[in-house]
Amino acid sequence: MIIGICGFIGSGKDTIADYLVNLHHFRRESFAATLKDAVAQVFGWDRTMLEGRTKQAREWREQVDPWWAERLHMPTLTPRWILQYWGTEVCRAGFHDDIWIASLENKLRHSQDDVVISDCRFPNEIRAIKKAGGRVIRVARGPEPAWYDAAVSVNRGANGNSTWALSQRKLEKFGVHASETAWVGTEF
């Protein structure tokens, strides 16, 4: 069985994944694992910190890396921004929209384990899990963000096409990245 989890930052996706791993012996995987491996190698950042599973790691990912910011002349460069930009604009848009799906499929193709994927962020990831016979759930905690209705409107207006680029342009004023909004309004 494959279970995919969607939700906003801090909604409890990792808590549910931990529950499935610890009590039901699921194998934990993520679409972004390969991305985080590559970014850790290129930038010399701690792989565990890139995961962002602790408060300290989440805070660290939001901090400007002074060496890289100066070296690349990008004063606001943070690990989180690199993960979002490299994962979405560079690899998904610049190479192939399904790159992270294919990477995980390749990793799992001979596995018989029950798997939980706690980082579903795009409609094509949700479709891939469903196509593989899995289920996708949304975790909600607290009120919807201020940009939620705008994201639903933008995403549904694309008639099921990949909408991450459109979402990013339309929602820029809210300061959220497409990886946080692309799944909003998707049928589970």
Model-derived segments and spans:
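Extreme N-terminal starter segment of soluble prokaryotic enzymes
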Residues: 1-3
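Small-molecule kinase domains that catalyze NTP-dependent phosphoryl transfer to phosphate-bearing small molecules
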Residues: 6-9, 104, 127-131, 139-188
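Conserved lysine of the Walker
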Residues: 13
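Hydrophobic positions on the alpha1 helix immediately C-terminal to the Walker A/P-loop
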Residues: 16
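Post-Walker A helix-loop "phosphate-sensing" segment adjacent to the P-loop in P-loop NTPases
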Residues: 22-29
